[in-house]
A protein has these predicted regions:
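C-terminal membrane-cytosol helix-exit motif in multi-pass small-molecule transporters
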Residues: 173-192, 386-391
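Conserved MFS/SLC helix-loop-helix module at the cytosolic interface between two early adjacent transmembrane helices
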Residues: 62-98
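Juxtamembrane intracellular "pre-TM" segments in multi-pass secondary transporters
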Residues: 2-6, 188-213, 237, 411
Length: 427
């Protein structure tokens, strides 16, 4: 199936959810470009800045799994729309924070809203398109994440220097309200075509999924460390102003990341046609190739050299986005797609992303930020090693592990109108 063969309903689902993902990551990442201004206003340490990111991530992590389970049981449209409206309001009110504590509270509430979106949105995408192109459509969905994150970083830098950090939160909160209302108008999905639920304890008996969790722990630690401390790195060590820092990082991430998402998703779907484990191969390859690029970016002597190597690192590291979600959904029956992805994000966010900003901040306080950012390079290599275990488990047991066999025998759960999911209208 080609992109030109998508029905109008499929394009509508993909476009709206990609735009919501864009807004999701604008709201999520904009704070990192605002760190220097917030630190100056509230007289904070690096560790306190790390706590701002960690509080958001802890709440996001704890909320993702139960909201993912909820999305497998009720209307995914309602879960998505309510989450978007909630996080947009919390982002807007972040601009009114009068103290470090009130800003910490507001950012934590943003985490609740955003936790509702990713598992439900990704489950809807997988249910709306054939498995043969699963990595590519998930890649399109994730392009919203990359472009949104880069836009948040760039916009934050420009707004902080021109107007201050508070108007930045006001500006990005409003569009999310409109997108939340649009999400509520998507076709109403059935929660599931089966009354029986897939217990998570059964999923935890699948070796490939367990190895995937460990790999995700390391790779998420690395990715979040780069995102959290990238703006501080380029301003304190690479000679960029606040405005230049946001724009420069956005350019490197958008060009490298979006090209990497497209490349990784295409290669993943291509390799999936050859072997059951083929889709997963692209992930550790990207992690390994990205490590030297990030290392050279840290030690680049010029701005141009930094941007080249950082963009190259973003290219390779972003190979995993589409294939990761596609691999999880390949391993899990449709009725458990949102729950499985929610549990994955609970684990990797709570136990890696939540601690990454603080760990790197503490090392930076004792040594320096460049030294601290060597730690995530080692973490991404560890993530690659554990994903080789995922591949081994798939080769040994297949994609459909015997533990979950009874759940695969039911009719697949489609997230939206049955005519939209799995087939092209008129085919």
């Amino acid at each position: 199936m080609k992109f030109t063969e998508f029905s109008r309903s499929q394009w509508r689902v993909l476009l709206i959810l990609m735009l919501v993902n864009f807004a999701n990551y604008v709201d999520r990442q904009i704070i990192f470009s605002l760190f220097p201004s917030i630190r100056h206003d509230f007289d904070l340490t690096y560790v306190q800045l790390g706590y701002l990111a960690t509080a958001f991530t802890v709440v996001l992590s704890l909320s993702t799994f139960p909201l993912g389970m909820l999305a497998d049981r009720i209307s995914r449209r309602t879960v998505i729309g309510a989450g978007v409206l909630f996080w947009s309001c919390a982002t807007f009110f972040s601009g009114w924070a009068g103290s470090f504590r009130s800003l910490l509270t507001a950012r934590s509430l943003v985490g609740v809203g955003e936790a509702a979106y990713t598992p439900a949105g990704a489950a809807v995408i997988s249910a709306s398109f054939p498995p043969q192109i699963r990595a590519r459509v998930q890649g399109v969905f994730d392009i919203g994440m990359f472009v949104g994150g880069a836009t948040g970083i760039a916009l934050g830098g420009v707004m902080a220097q021109s107007f201050g950090w508070r108007p930045a939160f006001f500006l990005v909160g409003i569009p999310g309200l409109l997108l939340g209302l649009s999400a509520l108008r998507l076709p109403e999905p059935p929660a599931s075509l089966s009354r029986e639920r897939m217990p998570v304890r059964e999923l935890l008996r699948v070796p490939a999924f367990l190895a995937l969790l460990v790999s995700g722990w390391f790779s998420s630690f690395a990715g979040y460390a780069y995102v959290a401390w990238g703006p501080e790195l380029v301003q304190d060590y690479k000679g960029f102003s606040a405005r230049e820092a946001g724009l420069a990082l956005a350019l490197a991430v958008v060009l490298g990341g979006t090209c990497g998402i497209a490349t990784g998703a295409y290669l993943s779907d291509l390799l999936a046609k050859l072997r059951s484990w083929g889709r997963a191969v692209i992930i550790p390859v990207g992690f390994v190739l990205g490590a030297p690029a990030i290392y050279f970016s840290l030690h680049a002597a010029s701005k141009l050299g930094f941007l080249f190597f950082f963009g190259l690192g973003a290219f390779f590291l972003s190979w995993y986005h589409g294939p990761l979600t596609a691999t999880i959904h390949d391993l899990v029956p449709p009725r458990g797609h949102a729950s499985a992805l929610g549990f994955y994000y609970l684990f990797v966010n709570l136990f890696s992303m939540a601690i990454a900003p603080v760990v790197i901040g503490r090392i930076a306080d004792h040594y320096n930020l460049i030294t601290a950012l060597h730690v995530p390079i080692l973490a991404q290599l560890a993530g690659a090693a554990f994903f080789l275990v995922v591949i081994y488990c798939i080769r040994r047991n297949g994609l459909h592990h015997p533990v979950l066999a009874r759940h695969w025998n039911d009719e697949p759960c489609t997230a939206f109108v049955p005519a939209v999911a799995l087939t092209v209208e008129g085919s």
